[in-house]
Amino acid sequence: MSLSHLSLKYFRNIEALTLEPVNGVNIIYGENGSGKTSLLEAIYYLSHGKSFRTSKHKSIIAHQQEQFVIHGRKAIHDLSIPIGISKTQAGETNLKIQGKASRKISELAQLMPVQIITPESYSLFFGGPKERRKFLDLGLFHVEHEFFFLWQSFNKVLKQRNALLKSKPKNYFDQIKFWDKEFVRLAEQINKLRMAYISRFKQQFFDKMCAELTLIRDLEISFNAGWKESESLSDALELNFERDARQGFTSKGPHKADFSFSVAGSSVENIFSRGQLKLLLYALKVTQNSLIESETDKQSILLIDDLPSELSEDTKEKVGQLLAHCSSQIFISSILSESISAVVEPMQRELQMFHVKHGNLITR
């Protein structure tokens, strides 16, 4: 159930390139600026419909070209499903799945679960709650099909409530009371799914990762729903109504949810070393992919950009031991192919090396 084929056209510095990856581990190496990260970016784009590097699509389209095109084939059991996405300078996006046009990025995302680890991924610890909600909700999107539609519906209600809080039309208090019923109904369903998912995530995380990482044995993963556990959401909305009206936005609800990592009451970002945080990050990502695969029967993809960056040899070996628990198809970018041998050896999986130079690919 892997990505068995990838072809790019006019994607950054890549004029035209075709890749036939293996189901196991794919190492993409080359000098900085060679195009290796662009390959990971293209795979990510094929699943998410956006880049992890920029929000400006024009910077992705090759110089003096009208559009970029990405094609792939996703092997699912005995089927080979063609998928594709293109984007023009004008911002028009075209999607195709099995030769048929689609308007929903979510259909591509469901077909090909993709997670990425980059040097910026440590925002999971140091960034705001939004980064952690994104991580949590990515897993929910794949394992709970109703979550996506609940979240879309909730955001429409949230937008309506916030608009009323800002504009304050006549009788807006009564209007907000009307919307609050739907707000609470959707919010409680979202919260129920999140709590159940975190419970399953924690069980798999500690069952699989404790043997590899002694540092997580005393780790606590705590979830905050976005309102106090001791009060109902209806009460929270009522108690905070005056403040929300002054500020013009809703301060309580699942859009404010967060979860945290701590040991003996202290946040991990304050007590773990940089190397320990890196290992924790890999353990969390591997667990998420494993949970998606076990609950959906889909093989996910893990992209790792610039893996050896700042990693000691001991840390590389531990990363390899963590990745050995991962049955995902893996793509790793690196400057030097030799520098990641300590990571690859413990994994004992099919391996393919790709050398990228000036946007061109050489299979080794």
Swiss-Prot record:
SUPFAM superfamilies: P-loop containing nucleoside triphosphate hydrolases. The keyword Nucleotide-binding applies. GO terms for biological process: DNA replication; DNA synthesis involved in DNA repair; double-strand break repair; SOS response. Pfam families: SMC_N. GO terms for molecular function: ATP binding; single-stranded DNA binding. ATP binds at residues 30-37. It comes from the Bacteria. Keywords: ATP-binding, Cytoplasm, DNA damage, DNA repair, DNA replication, DNA-binding, Nucleotide-binding, SOS response. One of its GO terms (cellular component) is cytoplasm. The RecF protein is involved in DNA metabolism; it is required for DNA replication and normal SOS inducibility. RecF binds preferentially to single-stranded, linear DNA. It also seems to bind ATP. Belongs to the RecF family. NCBIfam families: recf. This is DNA replication and repair protein RecF. It comes from Pseudoalteromonas translucida (strain TAC 125). The lineage of its organism: Bacteria, Pseudomonadati, Pseudomonadota, Gammaproteobacteria, Alteromonadales.
